[in-house]
Amino acid sequence: MAQQEAEIIRPLANFSPSLWGDQFIKNDSDAKVEDKISKTIEVLKEEVKSMLTATGTKMVDTMNLIDTLERLGVSYHFEHEIEEILQQFFNLNTDYNDEAYDLYTVATHFRLFRQHGHRITCADIFGRWRDENGKFHEGLKDDAKGLLSLYEASYLRTRGETILDEALDFTTASLKSIAPNLESPLRRQVEHALVQQLHWGNPRIEARNFISLYEEYEDKDESLLRFAKLDYNLLQMMHKEELHEVSRWWKELDLVAKLPYARDRVVECFFWAMGVYHEPQYSRARVMLTKTIAMTSIIDDTYDAYGTIEELDIFTEAIERWNVEEMKRLPEYIKPFYKALLELYEQFEEELAKEGRSYATHYAIESLKELVRSYHVEAKWFIQGYLPPFEEYLKNALITCTYCYHTTTSLLGVESAVREDFEWLSKKPKMLVAGLLICRVIDDIATYEVEKDRGQIATGIESYMRDNGATKEEAITKFFEIANDAWKDINEECMRPSPHSRDVLMRILNLERIIDVTYKGNEDGYTQPEKVLKPHIIALFVDPIQI
């Protein structure tokens, strides 16, 4: 038997160990400190609320305040008030062709309305900044704030909005050329925006960055700045407690020791979940999603970097049957994992049954079965050295990107997510497919070279190159085009009216934002977190903001 085992050739990936060790196992929270900060925040919150709801304030000033609150990461405190104000302003049907409104103002209002799902059209309001040939006026290069605002607004575009496509090209080139000559904090803001677009960014990372910028503003409001800093630190304390909880759970499972071939990335999994929802009311949802991502990561590595095809045949059947009796048939090394997976879902079901939502686990399990079937197909392609046509590859790869499953599990702990939402996701609606496409093609671009080095030929890039007689560079360009079009679809699907709550729609949007952050610079930040994710994790979960 030992000799037989020795003869098994496994496609090991030799993943790097966790960067964090036991750093987050220890819980150093201080209830007294948290309570003191909470009380201060409540006082400041009332001050800010008064600013927001004050009568007689000009629309332009109120919209600028809403934009500042959102950028500082504190708008969730005033969700209801902001929705009401934006609805009232939207109903005014403001004539933005009035010369009283400059480019900065018009673009900011357009972006804020679109971010909240209001169908404001772009053709009517940006036309006056173009010449008779339809080109944007060169003189706009003297208006850095206006350019930046238009640049950020253009990322809210939908299909067919060529004026926003052109605006993005024009503002990108213009901002790159003028950035070195700007004064900070505007220069810093422009340089950051060119690397990380506001609409595609992780809200917590963007909040921390903007707090440091806002501190440099000459016209900053000191109460608002203090409120944002304290709120950031208080949320960080909550997130650290949750990270402590999932780190302890992960350590007690001891799957890292039992399955040393797999990536040990529970901290990065929590970072992912926190990007989907950071607000206090989603605490349970974050923990549940983190656990499902961590378990999926092990399944992925088992198919991709360890299991033989015979072992994977048995494991696929065991997941399909979803029964503890299946453990008898499984290879020894995967038994502890299978048991832990079934027990995790039993805990979920028990928890959700208390609120009459145990049905949610059924949808999650069915989605996991679909994911595992697709992993199995991919593993067989690898073993056989089969390179499928791009259409066949993509059909399977949209499932193996894991976002079908993780969009579903992101709603497990969201109390407002109802059966109709899970049913909607199970039918692969347009918004979900757009999300799957972004996840798939951006992942494929980032992992292509590493997978090629490991002998993996059934990659999206290879398949597209062969089908279209394309070079690697042409394939990558096409994949970015696919992602950009998918973002347009997501923007469209976030518009009102929608049969689904923004609570649900924002989960899909935020899952895509995490892709943009994690694979920034065409790097696989999840597998190799040192360069891309480590600085973010330190800023979000280790270092508080100095008050």
Curated annotation (Swiss-Prot):
Note accompanying the cofactor annotation: Binds 3 Mg(2+) or Mn(2+) ions per subunit.
E.C. numbers: 4.2.3.-
Positions contributing to Mg(2+) 2 binding: 300, 304
Subcellular location: Plastid, Chloroplast
The protein, known as: Germacrene A synthase
Gene3D superfamilies, A to Z: Farnesyl Diphosphate Synthase, Terpene synthase, N-terminal domain
Family stated for the protein in its record: Belongs to the terpene synthase family. Tpsa subfamily.
Positions annotated to bind Mg(2+) 3: 443, 451
Tissue specificity of this protein: Expressed in leaves.
EC main group: lyase
Pathway involvement of the protein, from the record: Secondary metabolite biosynthesis; terpenoid biosynthesis
Main location: plastid
Any Pfam family hit: Terpene_synth
Example of a GO MF term: germacrene-A synthase activity
